[in-house]
Amino acid sequence: MAENSEGLGTVPEHERILQEIESTDTACVGPTLRSVYDDQPNAHKKFMEKLDACIRNHDKEIEKMCNFHHQGFVDAITELLKVRTDAEKLKVQVTDTNRRFQDAGKEVIIQTEDIIRCRIQQRNITTVVENLQYAFPVLEMYSKLKEQMTAKRYYSALKTMEQLENVYFPRVSQYRFCQLMIENLPKLREDIKEISMSDLKDFLESIRKHSDKIGETAMKQAQQQKTFSVALQKQNNVKFGKNMYINDRIPEERKENELKQGFEEEDENEEEILTVQDLVDFSPVYRCLHIYSVLGDEETFENYYRKQRKKQARLVLQPQSNMHETVDGYRRYFTQIVGFFVVEDHILHVTQGLVTRAYTDELWNMALSKIIAVLRAHSSYCTDPDLVLELKNLIVIFADTLQGYGFPVNRLFDLLFEIRDQYNETLLKKWAGVFRDIFEEDNYSPIPIVNEEEYKAVISKFPFQDPDFEKQSFPKKFPMSQSVPHIYIQVKEFIYASLKFSESLHRSSTEIDDMLRKSTNLLLTRTLSSCLLNLIRKPHIGLTELVQIIINTTHLEQACKYLEDFITNITNISQETVHTTRLYGLSTFKDARHAAEGEIYTKLNQKIDEFVQLADYDWTMSEPDGRASGYLMDLINFLRSIFQVFTHLPGKVAQTACMSACQHLSTSLMQMLLDSELKQISMGAVQQFNLDVIQCELFASSEPVPGFQGDTLQLAFIDLRQLLDLFMVWDWSTYLADYGQPASKYLRVNPNTALTLLEKMKDTSKKNNIFAQFRKNDRDKQKLIETVVKQLRSLVNGMSQHT
């Protein structure tokens, strides 16, 4: 049983080995067979038995397979026997085909002979080509030269000529066609020189026409660059908290009519920045320069180019006669010059030797002298400050543009200081008209206000500070008239306008502050002062207006310190800075006020004269009317009303005006008595005249203007009083006895005055008392008068001898 079980276990293993032998590559059978012998003893016998059994099985399968395919094999043999017949037929056909090929080969032999003859001809042609191989490149190069000439590729044509002369012509120089080509080359070179020179002339004419466009583009780019730099500086100043007035001097609402007006027609959208190469085709210059360089005549080309450009420079620098009339004339002049030198700068940097730095510097110095002379001459015709300002802005952009190209422009900025003085003069003329208009429109009455809004509106224009005035209830009146805030505003406008010119001059804040203060001083001391004086002297300006003018000048004088603070704020320069110029407004308004005071005195006296001219005395009346004359009472009432207006004036001014008026009235009354055309005066007329003088004395004693001490004002009439008392009392003995004594009762009576009046009364006595000589009293009075007249004459003669 054990053997059986062992045998049963071995059989599957042998089957596995057999399957592995059948399915494994022959090279790997060794290990498999070795495993047969590694097993139990006699295992290989069993394996051999198993192998024999497997072989028998395969033989049986092969036999079955052969039996299955035998009929097919028999059929194939039968078919093969049938093909033999067809093979014999095929042999006959192949033989026939071979015969026909032999017949056809005869024609091929003939064609082959023809080919041999062609080969011989080809060899001959090759020999000829080999002999002409040196001639064909010459012809090709010459043909290329013609094509280059036709295509206007002259520089390449010249290079081709050099190759022909140096490389190709020596190889075929023995041929006649080569000699003809050699003779034709100089003519071609001359043609190239003429054509290139013609192109250069066209180029020069083109850039002359397009210089203004080139210059306009360059100036616009310079302005954009400057605007960017200023904006960047503003940003930095804001970041570090610096004062912004110098870089942003004018408020936003005041920035119209700036330099951008010259280029505002351009599209402000983002666009490609054009360069001089985009606007001008410089290829003619390059070609001509290269051509003349190749021809060895570069110096001739350089001399011609520089000569022609100098001629164009003189034409560009020649301005139009009416250039000073509009800013466009100046702009066109500047853009042409900029365009010219931008082109020269480009030529300087892209070519070698055509123009040099020394040449451009010489050309620029010549041009700069001419430009300065032209601007100095034409700017002198400008009377519009806006035009002068636009000219300044153009000069600044012009200078900045050329400075960016390396040209020195310091002399242009020096010229701007000359133009600045002219600009200030035009501003002064303009503001003279502004001041005149303000004075013409003023009503010369205090500014009325009825509410807080109106009060703030005035305060916002003029720095008025008065605590007492602020405490007053509405409605109330400012002491000054409308012209004061208007003038103050216009002075600030003038400072703004003057500041506009100072921008972009590359000057320090201290220099700008000094310029502003000097120009403002000129405005105050010359323009405003002149306008005030002319206003004061106008015939239609009355006493009320003059009083208001004095009040106005007082407030304007007080506002000068605010103007100084205003300048300090916009320049950021402290008033305590050394060498800071002060404003002379104080002296200006003081002078104007003194002139107005003098005019008040003059007009007041003129008004008194007008009233005095209305006097209509009856110098022969026997008795007085018993009341003062009507003209005099009207005059006194007028003086009272006028002196009430004077209450707003400084005390000394009102007192001086009042004293001057009383003295002038006293003098006018005295002159009326002593008038040479008045021949006779009666005692009744003297008494009536005395009534008028009494009214004058009463007026003086009523203190029409406060501030007089005692009877100071009455002393204005002391001469008249003593004279009239002398004649009214007829106190000649006392006068003659005390004459010359300091304590004399009639110290103010001049003997000559008394003599003149006494003679007028003497003549009246004679005329009215023809028969009075028969009365004793009248005779005694007449003798007394004659005696007094003699004594007075002796006093007068003594005074004249003493004198």
Curated annotation (Swiss-Prot):
Transmembrane segments: none annotated. The keyword NAD does not apply. Its main location: cytoplasm. It is found in: Cytoplasm; Cytoplasm, Perinuclear region; Cell projection, Growth cone; Midbody, Midbody ring. Keywords: Cell projection, Cytoplasm, Exocytosis, Protein transport, Transport. GO terms for cellular component: exocyst; Flemming body; growth cone; perinuclear region of cytoplasm. GO terms for biological process: exocytosis; Golgi to plasma membrane transport; intracellular protein transport; vesicle tethering involved in exocytosis. The exocyst complex is composed of EXOC1, EXOC2, EXOC3, EXOC4, EXOC5, EXOC6, EXOC7 and EXOC8. Interacts with CNTRL. Interacts with RAB11A in a GTP-dependent manner. Component of the exocyst complex involved in the docking of exocytic vesicles with fusion sites on the plasma membrane. Together with RAB11A, RAB3IP, RAB8A, PARD3, PRKCI, ANXA2, CDC42 and DNMBP promotes transcytosis of PODXL to the apical membrane initiation sites (AMIS), apical surface formation and lumenogenesis. Belongs to the SEC15 family. This is Exocyst complex component 6. It comes from Canis lupus familiaris. The gene is EXOC6.
